[in-house]
């Protein structure tokens, strides 16, 4: 979903044409599957999904004693953008603790960040609870405005006009290709989005 711009047209078309496989799930079920991988167990139970029509389309999910059993979800690579990384290689995600779960569950975690903080954020009491340890981070790269056209809380807001521009361009494969050539594939010496 592209905020106010609606659904992501290229993803939607690829799913409709069967070019990518989409498996329906709930956020709690996905989080539980990631927690199973994080803990190194093959599956984990979750309550509250029983009775959902999603279960019929998920042969990998099992119901046992009124609990849904979901298999571990272990991503090959997690990619995300954070506000801060530090000199020790730790990454601050604040209250976005689901990112810590994803990092713990993944085989590799690659993070771009807005600003480098001196020292070790795990030693700063006010920041430590929102930090993912370098143990779970494979690599970081400084990328100011790296979330653009999306936003970073407390740093910059989403660029809704550009997201709308992308959504219009991405309605066709040709428009999407032109967008990629202009905004993604063309090297820039500097970048200063609105």
Model-found features: residue ranges?
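Conserved alpha/beta enzyme-core scaffold
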Residues: 1-194
């Amino acid at each position: 979903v592209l905020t106010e711009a609606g659904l992501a047209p290229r993803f939607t078309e690829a799913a409709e044409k069967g070019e990518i496989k989409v498996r329906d799930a709930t956020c709690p079920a996905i989080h539980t599957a990631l927690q199973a991988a994080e803990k190194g167990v093959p599956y984990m139970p979750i309550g509250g999904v029983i009775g959902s029509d999603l279960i019929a389309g998920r042969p990998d999910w099992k119901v046992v004693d009124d609990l849904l059993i979901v298999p571990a979800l272990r991503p090959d690579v997690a990619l995300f953008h954070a506000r801060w990384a530090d000199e020790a290689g730790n990454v601050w995600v604040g209250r976005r603790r689901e990112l810590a779960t994803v990092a713990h569950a993944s085989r590799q975690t690659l993070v771009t960040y807005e600003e480098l903080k001196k020292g070790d954020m795990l030693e700063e009491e006010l920041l430590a609870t929102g930090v993912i340890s370098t143990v779970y981070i494979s690599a970081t790269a400084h990328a100011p405005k790296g979330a653009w056209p999306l936003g970073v809380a407390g740093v910059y807001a989403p660029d809704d006009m550009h997201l709308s521009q992308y959504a219009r361009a991405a309605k066709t494969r040709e428009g999407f290709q032109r967008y990629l050539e202009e905004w993604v594939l063309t090297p820039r010496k500097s970048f200063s989005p609105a």
